[in-house]
Amino acid sequence: MSRFPAVAGRAPRRQEEGERPVELQEERPSAVRIADREEKGCTSQEGGTTPTFPIQKQRKKLIQAVRDNSFLIVTGNTGSGKTTQLPKYLYEAGFSQHGMIGVTQPRKVAAISVAQRVAEEMKCTLGSKVGYQVRFDDCSSKETAIKYMTDGCLLKHILGDPNLNKFSVIILDEAHERTLTTDILFGLLKKLFQDKSPNRKEHLKVVVMSATMELAKLSAFFGNCPIFDIPGRLYPVREKFCNLIGPRDRENTAYIQAIVKVTMDIHLNEMAGDILVFLTGQFEIEKSCELLFQMAESVDYDYDVQDTTLDGLLILPCYGSMTTDQQRRIFLPPPPGIRKCVISTNISATSLTIDGIRYVVDGGFVKQLNHNPRLGLDILEVVPISKSEALQRSGRAGRTASGKCFRIYSKDFWNQCMPDHVIPEIKRTSLTSVVLTLKCLAIHDVIRFPYLDPPNERLILEALKQLYQCDAIDRSGHVTRLGLSMVEFPLPPHLTCAVIRAASLDCEDLLLPIAAMLSVENVFIRPVDPEYQKEAEQKHRELAAKAGGFNDFATLAVIFEQCKSSGAPASWCQKHWIHWRCLFSAFRVEAQLRELIRKLKQQSDFPRETFEGPKHEVLRRCLCAGYFKNVARRSVGRTFCTMDGRGSPVHIHPSSALHEQETKLEWIIFHEVLVTTKVYARIVCPIRYEWVRDLLPKLHELNAHDLSSVARREMRDDARRKWTNKENVKQLKDGISKEVLKKMQRRNDDKSISDARARFLERKQQRIQDHSDTLKETG
């Protein structure tokens, strides 16, 4: 488990021999030193005072601009104060008298941390005047006037309040990230004003905030609304291309050693100032923390470091699945003489602002969800960042003083491999969940919905087909009663379908823990240290064996139940190398799902079924009801082929309990695929063909165009055009035939025949005369 945060320096607490690092361990040098500093009266940005921001000079103009316009775009550099200060200004100007001020964030970490910050500045308890709502966690009340939330939570709110009557202002923050949900919110808000609904509040205002984006395009989308620019206060940032990655290394992400070396060089050779390092995910971050700590431990601060005021390096990881307390540590100032180094995902590029950063190390890559048309699935891939994202990252080094950005890639990599802007998520991921939401909002024409960037029609049709396969829509593309129930669940439609099937069999207790575990991040800790890695793998194998050793879904259920019943869940997780924070989240998810199922089963028309058979078979049958699209059959050796019509080859992931048991299997279902050197199926269980025999035809029985009312209308129009053209041709042919007939009739009467004979004889007589004249001339 991670030992970080930790300080490597002159006098850190060394790990005892044989001691294993403990997750969430509080007795660490960094935490103790920071706490001591707070007790001595040193304050930080988190301490309840409002720092100065460039936005403060624009306060009056900005408030007036919001009053004067239904839509307003606010732009400014990251750190200008848009996220924390504008909602406060609007609250103090009285906007909350007509409803809440809602502020969306793409990530739950940002929604929570910003709400905490604003509550401290306004000197109120979090959940009172200032609150937040993220998936599975609603910290708000009737008193709440400023509500930070994920964009997904606002989309769910619109299902019950389509006209947003509870809000006076909607602020869509971080619009430049172009998440799928934010793009759908763009369209819904535009449609709300276009339709001129009589129930819409007159006072509703929409503010779109972005650090970097195609602003003219966004303004045109919202009816050429004004753009309010907040002048920035960024200091100059010098950029250096380290040339460690070139265009040929586009697929190569094995750059951890290089990044650690660059980071260590900064610590040794640059003057005071904190460091921010960008990597793609938790595994890379924890590995980098370990390597950097090992290097920093060997530094002699009397001779090796150029800045003699430095005594150590405080190493702090930052990624989405960390607890709130762990995330808060990155905002605290380091102890005197200690340089802070935050190693983070892309979340620190825009969503979080960390004071004191003067050096940025840009790894050049990000994890991105992309739709793989060959597999028909969304794949989480590591891809090069865009140029706009790279500029966002470098800007973090120039907030409080001049800084430096070290890009590990080359200038050629920048020019050849990095797109100018982020590719909108709506153009590269599955649209199944949002299409269902639009259908439930009575928006049936999902193809002609007002998208800022229209997605590929193929993605829309594929989403419709998947919803039909889950019985969420009927053959006409209209949402079913089941679809209306499914949209309430914070799960993907196929997993919701499996849960509802289990509820109809009165065995939801078997599936709810699994659904909850699949809703959180990977629960298994896989340490970098080889010794701990072996111990963790052994513990994970033991857990799989308790589930029968042949079903990864069942293993998740065993982990859930054993941890919950242990009496000391955090200690149980520590012993078994399981992320306690993920299990804690799963417990909350399971409770919410159980309440939704309870309400669903109270409906008089809820279907009831019976099944006589062992529990493990019932569980797998219910999984088949939702995952039959992810069915694969063994073909050759250890390779399986999907049965969705593509026949894509997949392999069982090495982390699965079924790995190296492939020859014993015939049919499997899987939760997701990962693409590395091969296409791997992850979280797998064996099934029987007869369980999916009646379900598989649904993958092929209907053309996706049949589910789209637009496609049907266009096909009808096309058919009408073809019929009209056919009739015109027929009429033309008929007209030609009548004309020909008249000519034939005219030619065949007696007068026509005698006239034709006379003309023939006349021409013959003329030829004879001409021939006679020629002979006379030659003679």
Swiss-Prot record:
Any single biological process term in GO: mRNA splicing, via spliceosome
List of residues binding ATP: 76-83
Domain of life (superkingdom): Eukaryota
GO CC terms, sorted: spliceosomal complex
UniProt catalytic activity: ATP + H2O = ADP + phosphate + H(+)
Ranges of biased composition (kind: Basic and acidic residues): 13-41
Nucleotide-binding among keywords: yes
PANTHER family in alphabetical order: ATP-DEPENDENT RNA HELICASE, ATP-DEPENDENT RNA HELICASE DHX40-RELATED
Protein name per the record: Probable ATP-dependent RNA helicase DHX40
Organism: Rattus norvegicus
Classification of source organism: Eukaryota, Metazoa, Chordata, Craniata, Vertebrata
Originating gene: Dhx40
